[in-house]
């Protein structure tokens, strides 16, 4: 920490420093106007989808090649899981892009709270030649968001609101009560007949309702302006007791002084979100599908939930609705930026921001779900202190133009947490509000946490252009982190890029149909620390248990891992080459880019010998991974008239990932990790006692491949049904389901190709827009089909309607249930009408209507192909019988401006 602070102080006085977030945004935009080296993607107001949209992520989805927005299955609750920019580049973490909102460092959760009506534009940085300006924080891409500010046109008021409802249109087709009874009797099986015919999907779902309102005020003059906005959302989802509320307040003010030489920018953003959910939503869907349909929807005459003691993996769906998993998040950030034009071509900028966040979580499981019940309360707080200054210079002489920036920044974070868990509930009436009324607190269930990492950085960049045709840009950033070992505190990340504006050459200047042609290439390096925390490099201890010492209970402590004093930054090197082509006054625009990136010094837990080491795992920088791909963007304006216009935007991305190595040298010792490691597997009823691993991490393959036995078909078994006929792949005369046995690489879980398309058409005051997304080249393991077609679980658990006819009595995984995951999904269609206004008071009035999740074109036989196909986790590529029911959202919107 001392070295980091000393470096910051020295560089502050030497370099005069830089605002690497807000000022990098502003300065880079100015450089882009004279440089052809950049491959930035801008999503501007005319491209932002109009109509009923829930959050900023709806705006971003499908708009940029290689950018994948992944939500929680099909649960579009406005709570995001992740965004991936050009795939996964690290095993241990740090794969989410850096989010910059008006120059302030943010995260994806905060981005999901911003109202589309507040957004001016998105800018997406993918290559290391652009992200190098953000150093280690931008290793996985950068998403810059500019929000709307005051225009100086006088006082204005705008309102944007929409109302909508959600309707479930597809869920698993399980046996109903009469079918369940008939099947059990036909097979001669004993079963419990509760006397009802209950559709448990109807028990746990409802018609969802959503409404949101956004009000904005702006005003001022050319030298002083402001904009304030307020937003509110109330969302009752299709799952009962699952609700979401969000309140947002935003204020921005800009002041100019000294004839415009001094510009001050002040901003405040705050939100409060509340989520009311149950403890295990996935268990709820599982139980609703597998529950005996002859059981009642509610309690019996004595007020007790009817349970099937033979079905230990599920619970009564109605009982699960009384679980609670409530959370409340409050976030407040403020920033102040000053920009002073010392000379006409010399600008000094300073920026500071403060962020405070608080997240509280409370969980409750009643005694009719867990025998002793369970309660949990936790609160986590965070503070970010961010400051930086910059000095930028630009000059033009003759045919030359030069832009240069030097600067430094400092980021200090503080994270604290406190939580308690207890069992032995006295009464369910207290819920989670009286933990003192419990009789048991599990060891380790009560604890706290603290960390305060810091990051100091220096940076410099130069861009030179000649005759506005040839450009070269170079940048160097150094980051020093308190989380890295003292031996490797600092990392330095250079980049260089070249650009050529071919259209301005003499041999093309008279070619009228070509409006623009630019070529570009670049190389850059960036660092990543996403896989470590403040304590990873330290010899840390934790409590082992309680013993009696001299009659007093004493907590014993012990080390928890091997320490590595040489941990350092992961390094990602990227090369890219691309072009931008505009034809016929840019009514047809093509952009394409080829890239290759390689992650080296990759953090991972490697196998080490004991007793040479105290533990059998050591985190070290040894592995490597590559990503390569091609991106294509097409924009067409086939119709452009006063009363009629049509725009078609299409993007496509091909990507190939490969895990190159998980072995190497550490202090003269060769260490390695397993070449074959399971990532995802099936569990639950019918998956007990088998080798049920499905998705693997295998060296030499993409992250997340299916490594499965090969099924030749079905064969009759001694149980009177059918089993999977598994091929003896290693010809040893036995069928071995274990890892390394009779298995083969059957495909990958992540798409090779993704597409996105936005089509809009306007006729006079009417317009219609449609968003289409798709993915191809990957596979999905239909674990839902395997589990609910397995008749060995019946009648303890319900099965699919087609299961009795197939009569498969087998739980083993194989490629029998591996299917193509290709799909094209119509994300939404919006129809709008801009009412012609004659009133001076009302400037514009727009009505809109929209349908989300309209239709999916796919050959996949399961509920939906839109599962987790991007994030490397235990759900990657697996449809695991716990999928959220499919629903559509129908919305009406109103926008008015005074």
Where are the model-predicted features located?
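C-terminal beta-barrel architecture of Gram-negative outer-membrane proteins
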Residues: 733, 767-827
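Short aromatic-centered micro-motifs
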Residues: 99, 464, 705, 729, ...
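Acidic, glycine-rich flexible loop segments
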Residues: 282-317
């Amino acid at each position: 920490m001392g070295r980091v602070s000393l470096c910051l102080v020295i560089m502050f006085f030497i370099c005069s420093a830089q605002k690497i977030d807000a000022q990098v945004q502003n300065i880079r935009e100015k450089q882009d106007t004279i440089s052809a080296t950049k491959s930035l993607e801008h999503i501007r107001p005319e491209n932002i989808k109009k109509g009923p949209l829930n959050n900023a992520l709806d705006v971003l989805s499908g708009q940029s090649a290689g950018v994948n927005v992944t939500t929680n299955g099909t649960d579009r609750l406005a709570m995001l899981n992740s965004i991936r920019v050009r795939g996964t580049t690290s095993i241990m973490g740090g794969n989410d892009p850096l989010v910059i909102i008006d120059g302030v460092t943010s995260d994806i959760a905060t981005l999901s709270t911003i109202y589309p009506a507040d957004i001016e534009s998105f800018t997406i940085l993918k290559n290391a030649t652009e992200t190098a300006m953000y150093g280690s924080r931008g290793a996985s891409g950068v998403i810059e968001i500019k929000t709307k500010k005051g225009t100086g046109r006088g006082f204005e008021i705008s309102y944007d609101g929409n109302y909508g409802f959600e309707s479930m249109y597809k869920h698993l087709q399980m046996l109903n009560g009469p079918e369940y009874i008939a099947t059990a009797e036909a097979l001669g099986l004993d079963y419990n007949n509760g006397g009802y015919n209950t559709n448990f999907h109807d028990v746990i779902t409802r018609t969802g309702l959503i409404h949101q309102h956004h009000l904005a005020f702006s005003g001022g003059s050319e030298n002083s302006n402001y904009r304030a906005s307020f937003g509110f959302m109330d969302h009752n989802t299709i799952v009962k007791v699952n609700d979401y509320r969000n309140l947002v307040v935003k204020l921005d003010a800009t002041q100019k002084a000294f004839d415009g030489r001094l510009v001050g920018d002040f901003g405040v953003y705050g939100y409060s979100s509340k989520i009311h959910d149950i403890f295990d939503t996935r268990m709820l869907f599982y139980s609703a599908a597998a529950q005996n349909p002859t059981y009642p929807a509610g309690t019996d005459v004595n007020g007790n939930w009817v349970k099937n003691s033979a079905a230990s993996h599920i619970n009564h769906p109605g009982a699960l609705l009384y679980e609670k998993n409530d959370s409340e998040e409050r976030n407040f950030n403020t920033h102040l930026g000053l920009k002073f034009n010392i000379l006409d071509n010399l600008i000094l900028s300073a920026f500071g921001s403060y962020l405070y966040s608080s997240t509280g979580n409370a969980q409750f499981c009643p005694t009719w779900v867990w025998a002793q019940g369970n309660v949990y309360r936790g609160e986590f707080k965070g503070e970010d202190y961010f400051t930086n200054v910059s000095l930028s210079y630009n000059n033009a002489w003759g045919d030359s133009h030069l832009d240069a920036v030097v600067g430094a920044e400092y980021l200090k974070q503080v994270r604290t947490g406190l939580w308690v868990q207890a069992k032995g509930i006295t009464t369910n009436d207290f819920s989670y509000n009286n933990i003192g009324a419990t009789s048991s607190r599990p060891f380790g269930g009560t604890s706290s946490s603290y960390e305060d990492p810091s990051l100091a950085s220096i940076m410099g960049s130069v861009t030179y252009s000649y005759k506005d045709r040839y450009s070269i840009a170079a940048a160097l950033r150094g980051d020093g982190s308190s989380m890295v070992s003292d031996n490797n505190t600092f990392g330095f990340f250079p980049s260089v890029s070249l650009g050529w504006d071919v259209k301005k050459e003499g041999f093309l200047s008279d070619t009228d149909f070509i409006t623009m042609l630019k070529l570009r290439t670049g190389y850059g390096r960036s660092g990543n620390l996403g896989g470590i925390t403040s304590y990873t490099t330290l010899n840390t201890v934790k409590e082992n248990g309680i013993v009696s010492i001299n009659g007093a209970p004493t907590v014993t402590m012990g080390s928890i891992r091997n320490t590595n004093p040489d941990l350092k930054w992961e390094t990602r090197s990227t090369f890219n080459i691309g072009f931008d082509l505009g034809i016929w006054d840019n009514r047809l625009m093509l952009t394409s880019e080829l890239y290759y990136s390689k992650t080296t010094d990759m953090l991972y837990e490697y196998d080490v010998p004991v007793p040479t080491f105290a533990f059998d795992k050591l985190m070290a920088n040894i592995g490597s991974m590559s990503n390569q791909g091609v991106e294509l963007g097409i924009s067409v304006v086939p119709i452009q008239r006063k009363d009629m216009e049509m725009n078609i935007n299409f993007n496509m991305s091909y990507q190939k990932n490969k895990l190159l190595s998980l072995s190497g040298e550490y202090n003269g010792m060769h260490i390695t990790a397993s070449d074959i490691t399971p990532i995802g597997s099936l569990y639950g009823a019918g998956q007990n006692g088998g080798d049920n691993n499905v998705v693997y991490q295998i060296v030499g393959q993409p992250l997340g491949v299916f490594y499965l036995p090969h099924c030749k078909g079905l064969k009759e078994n001694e149980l009177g049904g059918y089993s999977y006929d598994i091929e003896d792949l290693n010809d040893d005369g036995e069928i071995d389901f274990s890892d390394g046995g009779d298995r083969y690489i059957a495909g990958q879980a992540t798409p090779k190709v993704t597409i996105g398309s936005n089509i809009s058409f306007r006729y006079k005051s009417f317009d219609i827009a449609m968003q289409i997304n798709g993915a191809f080249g990957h596979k999905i393991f239909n674990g839902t089909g395997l589990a609910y077609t397995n008749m060995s679980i019946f009648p303890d658990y319900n099965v699919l309607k087609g299961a009795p006819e197939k009569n498969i009595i087998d739980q083993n995984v194989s490629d029998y249930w591996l299917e193509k995951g290709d799909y094209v999904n119509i994300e939404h269609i919006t129809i709008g009408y801009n009412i012609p206004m004659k009133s001076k008071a009302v400037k514009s009035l727009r009505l809109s209507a929209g349908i989300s999740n309209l239709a999916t074109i796919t050959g996949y036989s399961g509920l939906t192909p839109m599962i987790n196909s991007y994030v490397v986790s235990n759900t990657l590529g697996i449809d695991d019988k716990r999928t959220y029911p499919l629903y559509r959202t129908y919305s009406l919107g109103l926008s008015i401006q005074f």
